[in-house]
Amino acid sequence: MHKDIATPGRTKEILARYGFSFKKSLGQNFLIDTNILRKIVDAAGISGDTGAIEIGPGIGALTEQLARRAKKVVAFEIDSRLLPILADTLSAYDNVRIIHQDVLKADLHAVIAEEFAEVSDRMVVANLPYYVTTPIIMKLLTERLPIRGMVVMMQKEVADRLAAKPGTKDYGSLTIAVQYYTEAEVVMTVPRTVFMPQPNVDSAVIRLTKRSHPPVAVEDEEVFFQVVRASFAQRRKTLLNNLLNNLPDGKEKKEQIERALDAVGIDPRRRGETLDMAEFASLSNALMPLFRV
């Protein structure tokens, strides 16, 4: 068994050998605690039948733990300076493929079809770069990839938003988008002290398990998400105010919006954050006539 990458000493040694300096613009913070990495792999339920997709492998600390358990690991790395380091640190593992590409531009359906044809279980496992956490999560969800789900580390504040309940300060349009596609659960909080360099915030690991079908029935997903976003546009405003100001031609359609709210029994004076997903679904279905040209 090779010496783990994720220790302060080994990480420093690897970085010094390659003269690597962190790029703040890429949100590079490397984990230096093997125990936490193993817990992430455990939380993802990685087995010999799993194909794992990793985003931002850094110097390979998590990749190594995944490679020891998964059938195959495909990792997307945007920073070309890390490619020779990964080729070195992961040289003992023949089940790892590094793709030098921005995952936001990748055709993930094609990658999964090509790389994971022989695996029965597919999972995204990653320590996500903080500056692009939300776009990456939304890409993975909206593209409806053939995966079981994802276990990802992110800023604690964002993880709390993904797993939030209605009526709380963290609950918002991102919460609903994520929980429409998955069941969200914060697995653990990770202190900032186990990273190099140390970030300014604590992190959390969240498990998003893909739902076989959405928990609510909506006539049109695009309209549903548009209504949700409009309802949270200004948190201190009432639902009616937000809908009038943020739906297309909302002000001209005040009567229709009021009728729709009345039809589904939602008080127009409520705030968006008090509505649960089922209420948003009924409301967006009732507002469908506004979106028909």
UniProtKB/Swiss-Prot annotation:
One of its GO terms (cellular component) is cytosol. Keywords: Cytoplasm, Methyltransferase, RNA-binding, rRNA processing, S-adenosyl-L-methionine, Transferase. The keyword Phosphoprotein does not apply. InterPro entries: KsgA/Erm, rRNA_Ade_diMease-like_C, rRNA_Ade_Mease_Trfase_CS, rRNA_Ade_methylase_Trfase_N, rRNA_adenine_dimethylase, SAM-dependent_MTases_sf. CDD domains: AdoMet_MTases. Its main location: cytoplasm. It is an enzyme of class 2 (transferase). Pfam families: RrnaAD. Its EC number is 2.1.1.182. NCBIfam families: ksgA. This is Ribosomal RNA small subunit methyltransferase A. It comes from Geobacillus thermodenitrificans (strain NG80-2). The lineage of its organism: Bacteria, Bacillati, Bacillota, Bacilli, Bacillales.
